[in-house]
Amino acid sequence: MGLEKSFILFSLLVLVLGWVQPSLGKESSAQKFNRQHMDTEGSSNSSPTYCNQMMTPRGMTKGSCKPVNTFVHETLADVQAICSQGQVTCKNGKSNCYKSSCALHITDCRLKGNSKYPNCDYKTSDYQKHIIIACEGNPSVPVHFDASE
């Protein structure tokens, strides 16, 4: 009887771990936004190789070169505050995008035309622009970088 009970408990444990385990290492949309777009510490002003230095460690050159990416050089709190600013329509037609009320320091990274994986080579461009981000959740947090203007 004890062996049967142990087998049943073990089977239940395996079943539960099968459900839970896939979600343990999964990155949330907010975490992905932070990884791909936030650089509160840095600025590309001093380095034309900024994008090349940032894209690989941030996981945007795994399997292919991400063609375009924007880094925001502001505090996370300032970027999160955009989620309560001017609501605009996203490029995909959804209504969960918000435009910053002031221009922010950003760096655009664009894949150079002759660049091919695995040697991803990016052009670095600094700007002061308004950004448009998609926000979700309660509290509302950034989950997608939609545009800059």
From Swiss-Prot:
Spell out the disulfide connections.
C51-C109, C65-C120, C83-C135, C90-C97
Which keywords fit this entry according to its UniProt record? Answer: Disulfide bond, Endonuclease, Hydrolase, Lyase, Nuclease, Secreted, Signal
Q: Which reaction does it catalyse?
A: an [RNA] containing cytidine + H2O = an [RNA]-3'-cytidine-3'-phosphate + a 5'-hydroxy-ribonucleotide-3'-[RNA]; an [RNA] containing uridine + H2O = an [RNA]-3'-uridine-3'-phosphate + a 5'-hydroxy-ribonucleotide-3'-[RNA]
Q: Which residues are the signal sequence here?
A: 1-25
> Hey, what tissues is this thing expressed in?
Pancreas.
Q: Where in the cell is it found?
A: Secreted
Q: What is its EC number?
A: 4.6.1.18
Gene Ontology MF terms: lyase activity; nucleic acid binding; ribonuclease A activity
Q: Which residues form the active site?
A: H37 (proton acceptor), H144 (proton donor)
Q: Which PROSITE patterns match?
A: RNASE_PANCREATIC
| GO cellular component terms, A-Z | extracellular region
Binding annotation for substrate: K32, R35, K66, P67, V68, N69, T70, K91, R110
Which GO BP terms, alphabetically?
Answer: defense response to Gram-positive bacterium
Partners and quaternary state? Monomer. Interacts with and forms tight 1:1 complexes with RNH1. Dimerization of two such complexes may occur. Interaction with RNH1 inhibits this protein.
Its function? Endonuclease that catalyzes the cleavage of RNA on the 3' side of pyrimidine nucleotides. Acts on single-stranded and double-stranded RNA.
- Classification via PANTHER family: RIBONUCLEASE (PTHR11437), RIBONUCLEASE PANCREATIC (PTHR11437:SF24)
Family from the record: Belongs to the pancreatic ribonuclease family.
Q: What is this protein called?
A: Ribonuclease pancreatic
- Protein source organism: Leopoldamys edwardsi (Edwards's long-tailed giant rat)
